[in-house]
């Protein structure tokens, strides 16, 4: 099996690409890879919903920290890899309906990123296998094939190239979901990945790790866009109570205060223009603990 031949670097890259790709398998535009359904043509009968989905997914991925960044922040906290935090691959057999399979595909994708970031190669192989198993049950098992892996390895130093690779993969997924009217699947995958990512981050955060606390606080933005995305599928049976669950988490994030700073420009060592801004973020220990408890409760509902 090809996964046995991968180095931990390759697995880490596959984890990143996998999360991005599976998040893309339902709705969007071909303009950007972060547009969730670029693979799927725009539904002209619902132009407003299509536009909302594209915008929501774009914003979600703009505010989610990369696996590499999150791993660095977790490591700086002094935390060690904890396999017990991940959703056991033994649970995969329990997931028999579309909602369970899609949400936990996102969960396993986040766990795969977590394991590979800590160079846990054997764990990474297990979780890659679990993710592919759920993808097969959902009918999107060809999303990560050997050609994609080779392209990822060839372009591993260029994030822009990786993004383009996922954009190209959009087209391969069009038939899987559009023809069977399952566009909501991708939204559930994104939700699962978001839930697990926040769960892992809050499980490692400490009172003195300000950077990790800030990144957790900033998920206030991605959660808003995630809810906007899910709202476009309101009434679709497969979603169940996930919108209400996300809004319950959002209520706690209302206590997070983020004041945007002045936008500044600079150049990196290669002379490229860099644009950024510094924000003032306020999140109390009480709010952080409440978010941690809530995300754990919600997450446990979906992995059991």
Residue spans for each PLM region:
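Bacterial N-terminal signal peptides that target proteins for export
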Residues: 2-12
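Bacterial lipoprotein signal-peptidase II cleavage site
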Residues: 25-33
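A cross-kingdom marker for long, charged
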Residues: 28, 234-304
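Secondary-structure edge/capping motif, primarily at the C-terminal ends of alpha-helices
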Residues: 112-119, 138, 142, 176-180, ...
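Extended amphipathic alpha-helical interaction segments
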Residues: 158-243
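N-terminal Sec/ER secretory leader and immediately downstream segment
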Residues: 34-151
């Amino acid at each position: 099996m090809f996964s046995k031949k991968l180095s931990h670097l390759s697995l880490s890259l596959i984890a990143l690409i996998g999360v991005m790709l599976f998040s893309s398998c339902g709705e969007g535009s071909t303009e950007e890879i972060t547009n969730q359904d670029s693979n799927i043509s725009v539904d002209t009968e619902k132009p407003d919903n299509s536009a909302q989905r594209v915008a929501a997914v774009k914003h979600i991925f703009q505010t989610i920290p990369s696996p590499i960044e999150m791993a660095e922040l977790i490591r700086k906290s002094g935390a060690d890899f904890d396999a017990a935090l991940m959703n056991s691959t033994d649970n995969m057999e329990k997931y028999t309906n579309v909602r369970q399979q899609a949400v936990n595909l996102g969960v396993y994708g986040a766990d795969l990123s977590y394991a590979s970031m800590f160079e846990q190669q054997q764990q990474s192989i297990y979780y890659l296998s679990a993710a592919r198993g759920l993808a097969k049950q959902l009918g999107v098992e060809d999303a990560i094939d050997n050609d994609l892996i080779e392209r990822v390895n060839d372009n591993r130093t260029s994030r822009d190239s990786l993004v383009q690779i996922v954009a190209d993969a959009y087209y391969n997924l069009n038939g899987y979901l559009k023809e069977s009217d399952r566009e909501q699947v991708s939204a559930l995958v994104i939700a699962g990945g978001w839930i697990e990512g926040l769960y892992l981050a809050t499980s490692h955060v400490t009172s003195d790790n300000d950077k990790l606390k800030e990144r957790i606080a900033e998920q206030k933005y991605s959660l808003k866009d995630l809810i906007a995305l899910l709202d476009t599928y309101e009434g679709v049976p497969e979603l169940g109570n996930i919108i209400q669950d996300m809004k319950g988490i959002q209520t706690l994030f209302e206590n997070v205060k983020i004041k945007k700073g002045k936008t500044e420009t600079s150049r990196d060592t290669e002379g490229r223009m860099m644009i950024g801004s510094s924000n003032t973020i306020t999140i109390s220990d009480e709010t952080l603990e409440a978010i941690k408890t809530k995300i754990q409760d919600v997450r446990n509902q979906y992995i059991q």
